[in-house]
Amino acid sequence: MNIVLLNPEIPYNTGNIGRTSVLTNTKLHLIKPLGFSLDEKQLKRAGLDYWHLVDLVVWESYEEFVEANKEARIFYATTKTKQRYSDIEFKENDFVMFGPESRGIPEEILNAHKENCITIPMIDMGRSLNLSNSAAIILYEALRQTDFNFKK
């Protein structure tokens, strides 16, 4: 599996997702611009002593990421769809993208990939769940569906 963070803003979330990625043998993709430095203390603190083990790919732009992954199945996590993440039949090499914490994936990207937009059901009381929690929820459903096959 692959987790993709488009323009992440909060180092603690990215560090926590990095730790989850290590313990599930999942590749983590970060798409610039980032809201922090990869050397930041908060990032490494959230990732504990796992950060140096993260299978990390850093992309200069969304366009570069898309060009390099043309054949990939990419799902876009958003609150702006009705299609539940649990209704998807995930495959081992799928990608799940999450947008910046403050605004989510841009509308133009979502509109271009409506059939691959997925959501986590929740009540209408708040905007969204925490990014690292959302990544873990969807990742573990994908891993459950693939029999927790932790290979790359």
Over which residues does each language-model region extend?
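Post-transcriptional modification and biogenesis factors for structured RNAs
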Residues: 1-152
